[in-house]
From Swiss-Prot:
Tissues expressing this chain: Expressed exclusively in liver in both embryo and adult.
Cytoplasmic side: 1-9, 167-177, 226-234, 281-349, 399-406, 456-470, 516-547
SUPFAM superfamilies: MFS general substrate transporter
GO function term, MF aspect, one: transmembrane transporter activity
Keyword set includes Endoplasmic reticulum: no
Taxonomy, superkingdom: Eukaryota
Alphabetical list of PANTHER family matching this protein: SOLUTE CARRIER FAMILY 22 MEMBER (PTHR24064)
Keywords: Glycoprotein, Membrane, Transmembrane, Transmembrane helix, Transport
A biological process from GO: organic anion transport
Source organism: Homo sapiens (Human)
High-level lineage: Eukaryota, Metazoa, Chordata, Craniata, Vertebrata
Compartment annotation: Membrane
Protein name as annotated: Solute carrier family 22 member 25
Length: 547
């Protein structure tokens, strides 16, 4: 008897599974806030140098009380080509001759300027406090803003590897509960971090815990339901991410202080940690790891909650042992990474899929992590991005059932590249058009990544699917980490990061054409199925999986 058949007897999607799924997805909505928290906590406010004549509160009316604030600003701060005050320079001495001029120096030499040696003054009308104002992450220190985002994404990459291994060894529930506690502690501490170094270190740990929670949530949901409900469950977890992004925009609009926002995002994880004690461990994991008594206990609990009255009679150790035999035989058929890469077709597929995930993830995170570079209203952008990814997740099942995998991904990536490159030529004043292009690009990226994930599961045989997915997932996390660092290049050329994002989107759309088409093809079970692909392609079409 297969384990899926055993779950059918327990109840493939009964009250037990629904309650566990609802709790886990509700928790994930809050956890997903962490992935884009820096869009608000690290918002760069308008700023200028602190100058004695303007900002010294001990001098009543700024001493020369007959002059307006605008006049004092004109003689203290040089103006740029757009006639706006420079953000990182000030005059060494007040330029009184500029009072009756428009900030220019006709027929005269440029006066001496200096960096903002006394600090900065910020326009705090949008946010009273961010990590930028807390540690002056502007001008020469502005790249540290991107470093904070990079370290969070790097933490997600490390967490995927470390906690994935720990989850296989110590159980889904134990690692999930530990990750809730870790995120609660480091997130709360980050709100009161004394230095940017401490803050970045805590955000790295928060990234590791966040990715661990996301992965183990999916595992606990999928390993408790039968195969026919997996696609629906995964779609719901993706929708939870979108809802999390929408609610983040709303919460950040209400809570403008960085410290309070950090606390609101992190403190609920203490509650999640306490409530998670009532979650059920994966019975599949318990059985495979030689804990049949505990596995049987969890199965009987699930059966009782699903309304099965004679669970003890049906779910016996003899039945469980027959299930264990098949599951353990499948678990023992493992291949090392070197063995996988020595198989030409497997190696080629893993390499191409890894690049596609890497190249498609870069522009997605490039858009979603840098809202301030796209428009002035970051709250609206955050909400729109969440809404369009939610729509993409709802459209994904239809697209997967009616469109070619390769063609759909190519068109979506080309649409994404078009939006990214078009943003370069749209001036900042045309906010509506920039928002429309960015939102359309995020929708295309989200739908393209979903299609890529489905094709990945259809191209890799079941026996090595978990290991191969781990490899491609690492490349996706690397892409997300690099996307945040690439924005540092905007210091040298504002269009350069968007050009790079667009190029990667185009490359992703081209490389996917090198992969076989998998729509209406049966899922592969063994490596031999891949080697015999030419023969299998002649078989009658079967319904494809959306997993």
């Amino acid at each position: 008897m297969a384990f899926q058949d055993l779950l059918d007897q327990v109840g493939g999607l009964g009250r037990f599974q629904i309650l566990q799924m609802v709790f886990l997805i509700m928790f994930n909505v809050i956890v997903y806030h962490q992935t884009q928290l820096e869009n608000f906590a690290a918002f760069i406010l308008d700023h200028r140098c602190w100058v004695h004549i303007l900002d010294n509160d001990t001098i009543p009316d700024n001493d020369p009380g007959t002059l307006s604030q605008d006049a004092l600003l004109r003689i203290s701060i040089p103006f740029d080509s757009n006639l706006r005050p420079e953000k990182c320079r000030r005059f060494v001495h007040p330029q009184w001759k500029l009072i009756h001029l428009n900030g220019t120096f006709p027929n005269t030499s440029e006066p001496d300027t200096e960096p903002c040696v006394d600090g900065w003054v910020y326009d705090q009308s949008s946010f009273p406090s961010t990590i930028v104002t807390k540690w002056d992450l502007v001008c020469e220190s502005q790249p540290l803003n991107s470093v904070a985002k990079f370290l969070f994404m790097a933490g997600m990459m490390v967490g995927g590897n470390l906690y994935g291994h720990l989850s296989d060894r110590f159980g889904r529930k134990f690692v999930l509960r530990w990750s809730y506690l870790q995120l609660a502690i480091v997130g709360t501490c980050a709100a009161f971090a004394p230095t940017i170094l401490v803050y970045c270190s805590l955000r790295f740990l928060a990234g590791a815990a966040t990715f661990s929670i996301i992965v183990n949530t999916v595992l606990l949901i999928v390993e408790w339901i039968t195969h026919q409900f997996c696609a629906m469950a995964l779609t719901l977890t993706l929708c939870a991410a979108s809802i999390g992004h929408i609610t983040l925009g709303s919460l950040a609009f209400v809570i403008r202080d960085q410290c309070i926002l950090q606390l609101v995002m992190s403190a609920p994880c203490f509650v999640f940690f306490l409530f998670s004690r009532w979650l059920a461990e994966s019975a599949r994991w318990l059985i495979i790891n030689n804990k049949p008594e505990e596995g049987l206990k969890e199965l009987r609990k699930a059966a009782h909650r699903n309304g099965m009255k004679n669970a003890e009679d049906i779910l016996t150790m003899e039945v469980l042992k027959s299930t264990m035999k098949q599951e353990l035989e499948a678990a023992q058929k493992k291949h090392s990474l070197c063995e996988l890469l020595r198989i030409p077709n497997i190696c080629k597929r893993i390499c191409f899929l890894s690049f596609v995930r890497f190249a498609s993830t870069i522009p997605f995170w490039g858009l979603t992590l840098h809202l301030q570079h796209l428009g002035n209203n970051v709250f609206l952008l955050q909400t729109l991005f969440g809404a369009v990814t939610l729509l993409a997740n709802c459209v994904a099942p239809w697209a997967l059932n009616h469109m070619s995998r390769r063609l759909s991904q190519m068109l979506l990536m080309f649409l994404l590249a078009t939006c990214l490159l078009a943003i370069i030529f749209v001036p900042q004043e045309m906010q509506t058009l920039r928002v429309v292009l960015a939102t359309l690009g995020v929708g295309a990226a989200s739908l393209g990544i979903t299609c890529s994930t489905a094709q990945e599961n259809e191209l890799i045989p079941s026996i090595i699917r978990g290991r191969a997915t781990g490899i491609t997932g690492n490349f996706a996390n690397i892409g997300g980490a690099l996307a945040s660092l690439m924005m540092i290049l905007s210091i040298y050329s504002r269009p350069l990061p968007w050009i790079i994002y667009g190029v990667f989107a185009i490359l992703s759309g081209l490389v996917v054409l090198l992969l076989p088409e998998t729509r209406n093809q049966p899922l592969l079970d063994s490596i031999q199925d891949v080697e015999n692909e030419g023969v299998n392609s002649l078989a009658a079409p079967q319904r494809s999986s959306v997993l």
